[in-house]
Swiss-Prot record:
A molecular-function term among this protein's GO annotations: GDP-Man:Man3GlcNAc2-PP-Dol alpha-1,2-mannosyltransferase activity
Principal location listed in the UniProt entry: endoplasmic reticulum
Membrane topology: Single-pass membrane protein
EC class: transferase
Keyword Transmembrane: yes
Biological process according to GO: dolichol-linked oligosaccharide biosynthetic process; protein N-linked glycosylation
Family indicated by similarity: Belongs to the glycosyltransferase group 1 family. Glycosyltransferase 4 subfamily.
Catalysed reaction, written as an equation: an alpha-D-Man-(1->3)-[alpha-D-Man-(1->6)]-beta-D-Man-(1->4)-beta-D-GlcNAc-(1->4)-alpha-D-GlcNAc-diphospho-di-trans,poly-cis-dolichol + 2 GDP-alpha-D-mannose = an alpha-D-Man-(1->2)-alpha-D-Man-(1->2)-alpha-D-Man-(1->3)-[alpha-D-Man-(1->6)]-beta-D-Man-(1->4)-beta-D-GlcNAc-(1->4)-alpha-D-GlcNAc-diphospho-di-trans,poly-cis-dolichol + 2 GDP + 2 H(+)
Organism of this sequence: Xenopus laevis
Name used for this protein in its record: GDP-Man:Man(3)GlcNAc(2)-PP-Dol alpha-1,2-mannosyltransferase
Pfam families: ALG11_N (PF15924), Glycos_transf_1 (PF00534)
Enzyme Commission number, as recorded: 2.4.1.131
Intramembrane stretches: 230-250, 394-414
Length: 486
């Protein structure tokens, strides 16, 4: 009898414990659902309706781009996307969520015209956000990915409560805002992915314990810390995959990004490659037959002053090149770094690069936030276009260098390797490298070519970049984003 009685006692105990837990769980779920419904209704009530001349409700199309006044390739995508949508959907209202409070609407639009030669045909409204600092990497010395992602949710909530759109497009890579606008805002949501927040390559770097800009040496040298970081990355990748899968339309900028986004988001039916717009036509106007064979040779780099661009590698490679040259030859070579600074952190990085060039004893010219015409002038005079970012998602600056007639030397990875610096009709279009020595050797080789050999490579490169024009981007962007407007 003791056995059955003991079993009955166990069952009564489990029942006594299970029922309160079940009731509590159901209660919490009901509270969550009720809270969600109330929040969604509250957000929907904030939605403003404007009626067009035809009596129909105007659609509000909003782009989430907290750094819209920066001068990088991502901003060129934003302005070209806006221009293309305004041409097709003339009656829509266009909004940009931005944190650029230090600039007026007019200054931002004038900046886009000066840097990218882009002018919009219709007005655009700016929603200025107060909490952009929450997505600054400097706020999160540890757990940077998680911190910035959670910060983007808070920033996204501020954006949503200030303006509830019909169509929401994240054009800067803040995927954690997508479920916010879809489920609370009731919006059709789309995104243009320049670079996955986390990738299989990042997991591989941590797993192999290699030190990089996003994997500190004290972690890579410690097996326990590397294991913990790997777990953190895997969990983050799961959440990143879920928030990304909330998007109704997914556009990516290269074969490399496409592959990684499919691995993480698993939405092949909604994902398409839309190469970013490059102002190739303006650069194709440069005559490459007359001015490229001066005795002096400049090496020009285009790219925002961010850590992943690896400008120190450019400076060290150029220093290694100069070591191979005589004093007379060194005097005829110069390195020019052209890029945009988004914040104080980027400006500090420029100061550190200047210090590095001084320590190595080499002259480097820094051109920060320069207008478009000055950028064009430097490219028209350059012999080599230099790019050093590992696993660059695409590389608009690379395409611009090729269109301008420079001989491109890019990193042997990512978009440059898979999409851009590839043979055109079986003819060479540029060079690839991946270390200080290989970059220095490649630059030395380019300078040793005859003028005729260099001209042949330039011409092949120019012929290959037509697929990256503004016109191609606009056609593909409109085709991919069309489901959002149905």
């Amino acid at each position: 009898m003791a056995g059955p009685m003991c079993l009955c006692g166990m069952m009564r105990l489990l029942t006594a414990l299970f029922i309160p837990v079940l009731i509590t769980s159901v209660g919490l779920c009901l509270i969550f659902v009720l809270l969600f419904i109330c929040t969604r209704l509250w957000v929907q009530r904030k939605k403003k309706v404007e009626i067009g001349k035809d009596g129909k409700k105007k659609k509000v199309v909003a782009f989430f781009h907290p750094y819209c006044n920066a001068g990088g390739g991502g901003e060129r995508v934003l302005w070209c996307a806006l221009r293309s949508l305004q041409k097709r959907y003339k009656d829509a209202i266009y909004v940009i969520y931005t944190g650029d409070k230090d600039a007026s609407e007019e200054q931002i639009l004038n900046g886009a015209a000066a840097r990218f030669n882009i002018k919009l045909s219709h007005p655009v409204r700016f929603i200025f956000l107060e909490k952009r600092g929450l997505v600054e990497a400097s706020c999160y010395p540890r757990f940077t990915l998680l911190g910035q992602s959670l910060g983007s949710v808070v920033l996204g909530w501020e954006a949503l409560t200030k303006c509830v759109p019909d169509i929401y497009i994240d054009s800067m890579g803040y995927a954690f805002t997508l479920p916010l606008f879809k489920y609370l805002g009731g919006c059709h949501v789309g995104c243009y992915v320049h670079y996955p927040t986390i990738s299989m390559d990042m997991l591989s770097v941590v797993r192999s314990q290699h030190a990089r800009f996003n994997n500190a040496a004290f972690i890579s040298n410690n097996p326990v810390l590397s294991r913990l970081k790997l777990i953190y990355y895997y969990l983050f990748a799961l959440f990143y995959g879920w928030v990304g899968s909330c998007s109704d339309v997914i556009m990516v900028n290269s074969t490399w990004t496409f592959s990684h986004i499919l691995d993480l988001w698993k939405c092949s039916d909604r994902t398409s490659i839309v190469y970013p717009p490059c102002d190739v036509q303006t650069f194709l106007e440069i005559d490459i037959n007359q001015h490229k064979e001066n005795e002096e040779h400049s090496v020009v780099s285009i790219g925002q002053f961010r850590p992943e661009k690896d400008h120190p590698l450019q400076i060290r490679a150029f220093a290694a090149l100069l070591e191979k040259k005589t004093a007379e030859q060194r005097a005829k070579l110069k390195l020019i770094l052209i890029g945009g600074c988004r914040n104080d952190e980027d400006e500090l990085r420029v100061s550190e690069l200047k210090k590095l060039s001084s320590e190595l004893g080499i002259p480097v010219e820094f051109k920060v936030n320069v207008p478009f015409e000055e950028l064009k002038k430097h490219l028209s005079e350059a012999t080599i276009g230099l790019h050093t970012m590992w696993n660059e998602h695409f590389g608009i600056g690379i395409v611009e260098c090729m269109a301008a007639g420079t001989i491109i030397l890019a990193h042997n990875s990512g978009g440059p390797k898979l999409d851009i610096v590839v043979p055109h009709e079986e003819q060479q279009t540029g060079f690839l490298a991946d270390s200080v020595d290989s970059y220095a050797a490649a630059m030395d080789h380019i300078l040793s070519l005859t003028p005729e050999q260099r001209l042949s490579i330039r011409q092949n490169a120019r012929l290959s970049v037509g697929r990256f024009s503004d016109q191609e981007f606009e056609a593909n962007f409109l085709a991919s984003s069309e489901p959002l407007f149905k």
